[in-house]
Design a protein with these regions (language model features):
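N-terminal membrane-anchoring alpha-helices
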Residues: 1-14
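Thr-Gly-centered strand-to-loop micro-motif
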Residues: 16, 53-55, 77-78, 106, ...
Length: 199
């Protein structure tokens, strides 16, 4: 479906270094969340054996919320620490036992700014608990193809860049903050590079 939508929208999407996703599986795939159309933007990269982390509120969305839960995706209640810990622990076990990757937007919500927002900790707790690598993924700014304020879409080119995996094996909770800084720093640098290459 995403291929059809890309053709309809006139988007030319290139994915750089996509091999990092398969080579690192199972992994936590940390993705820059640019717009409501990210399902189309990143659709060609989404692995076959993967689930998505979403906030608990997603479950309340009619039809979509039911589908999200029914397909095995992970819901986390950020307002209830004990519930969040239990969800992360269960998710870590699934990642290890079923060897599934987890797709997550670490900023927590959409951000069309060139500067990444502070990252949420949940996915990093999961990566440490499961002892699987983190694969950062960024894309070029979408302001040339999506006008979110006027709800307009234009044809154009989008570049997605998959960065080398960042290992977590042997790391613990004491390494959480440095790990977050490393991942965010590499993603920001990659976004900045894509912007400079676009001229």
């Amino acid at each position: 479906l995403h291929w059809i939508m890309r053709a309809v929208l006139g988007w030319r999407i290139t994915i750089e270094d996509r091999g990092h996703v398969a080579e690192s599986a199972p992994a936590i795939l940390m993705v820059a969340h640019k717009s409501n159309l990210d399902i189309i933007v990143y659709g060609g990269l989404y692995p076959k054996h993967a689930v998505v982390i979403g906030k608990k509120e997603v479950a309340k969305i009619p039809v979509f919320g039911w589908f999200f839960r029914a397909t095995g995706n992970i819901l986390i209640d950020r307002k209830d620490l004990q519930s969040a810990i239990a969800s992360i622990t269960a998710a870590a076990a699934r990642v290890r036992e079923k060897r599934i990757s987890v797709w997550v937007f670490p900023e927590g919500h959409r951000n069309d700014s060139p500067t990444l927002l502070p990252f949420k900790k949940g996915a990093f707790h999961l990566a440490l608990a499961a002892q699987v690598p983190i694969v950062p993924i960024v894309c070029s700014q979408l302001d040339g193809v999506v006008d979110g304020h006027r709800l307009l879409i234009y044809p154009g080119r989008i570049r997605i860049r998959v960065l080398p995996a960042i290992p977590t094996e042997g790391l613990g909770e004491a390494d959480l903050e440095p790990l977050m800084e490393t991942v965010r720093g590499r993603m920001q640098a990659a976004q900045d590079q894509l912007a400079s290459e676009a001229g």
